[in-house]
Amino acid sequence: MDKIIKSIAQSGAFRAYVLDSTETVALAQEKHNTLSSSTVALGRTLIANQILAANQKGDSKITVKVIGDSSFGHIISVADTKGHVKGYIQNTGVDIKKTETGEVLVGPFMGNGHFVTIIDYGTGNPYTSTTPLITGEIGEDFAYYLTESEQTPSAIGLNVLLDENDKVKVAGGFMVQVLPEASEEEIARYEKRLQEMPAISHLLASKNHVDALLEAIYGDEPYKRLSEEPLSFQCDCSRERFEAALMTLPKADLQAMIDEDKGAEIVCQFCGTKYQFNESDLEAIISDKA
């Protein structure tokens, strides 16, 4: 089961979130039938949103959009504070040549664009923030967002590793943030440790990558685990929701679906689930609109 572990240095100088998101990204790949590069780009976006959602309280909904002018198109993810995330990538078929080490490149092909976040607190006034893509690698772009929009300097690492068949082998990441209590000496020590950390891909390839990430972040510094919470890919779409959407269409449009298509098929963008509405279903909707 996927999980996020929240921890804090015993000194109170900084905190860290460490994630195992392997099942989340694997299910997203299965749902959308994504090829290698699309899988990694979508996976990184999902992991970034899992981190962002874990930082919120209440019943907030968090939307992350990675909008570039590349062949990936838009990448959209929606998460809640209960560990659920869903998402899709506009172009599922991007399969760019890997590096010599087998890693999939994303940044060089993302193009210019923006990292957009929308946090809906349920009050009717969602908070929206837009920052430019810095590298297109998504992790660095997320870190830049946290620094610029939330005024919280953060170290972010996230990645998706694929096997020889381009299926998700492991996915996960981390976030480290300095807290106000940190002294200059503690900040300097923290920055030095981060600079010396192995690459995120190397840590994810470890036998137990969650422990490997924590060890790399804290080193010999004492810390305590605050919580361990489950994560999952979960879509909240339903037939009732799409039926309500059909109710908003003009009667003429619904009648055209009956006359021309003998019904309607609606496919959820986030999970690929198909919902069929036959002629009788559409006629009932028209009748309810009367």
Curated annotation (Swiss-Prot):
<dbReference type="GO" id="GO:0044183">
    <property type="term" value="F:protein folding chaperone"/>
</dbReference>
<keyword id="KW-0963">Cytoplasm</keyword>
<feature type="disulfide bond" description="Redox-active">
    <location>
        <begin position="268"/>
        <end position="271"/>
    </location>
</feature>
<dbReference type="InterPro" id="IPR000397">
    <property type="entry name" value="Heat_shock_Hsp33"/>
</dbReference>
<comment type="function">
    <text>Redox regulated molecular chaperone. Protects both thermally unfolding and oxidatively damaged proteins from irreversible aggregation. Plays an important role in the bacterial defense system toward oxidative stress.</text>
</comment>
<dbReference type="GO" id="GO:0042026">
    <property type="term" value="P:protein refolding"/>
</dbReference>
<keyword id="KW-0862">Zinc</keyword>
<dbReference type="Pfam" id="PF01430">
    <property type="entry name" value="HSP33"/>
</dbReference>
<dbReference type="InterPro" id="IPR016154">
    <property type="entry name" value="Heat_shock_Hsp33_C"/>
</dbReference>
<keyword id="KW-1015">Disulfide bond</keyword>
<dbReference type="GO" id="GO:0005737">
    <property type="term" value="C:cytoplasm"/>
</dbReference>
<dbReference type="GO" id="GO:0051082">
    <property type="term" value="F:unfolded protein binding"/>
</dbReference>
<keyword id="KW-0676">Redox-active center</keyword>
<dbReference type="InterPro" id="IPR016153">
    <property type="entry name" value="Heat_shock_Hsp33_N"/>
</dbReference>
<comment type="similarity">
    <text>Belongs to the HSP33 family.</text>
</comment>
<keyword id="KW-0143">Chaperone</keyword>
<protein>
    <recommendedName>
        <fullName>33 kDa chaperonin</fullName>
    </recommendedName>
</protein>
<feature type="disulfide bond" description="Redox-active">
    <location>
        <begin position="235"/>
        <end position="237"/>
    </location>
</feature>
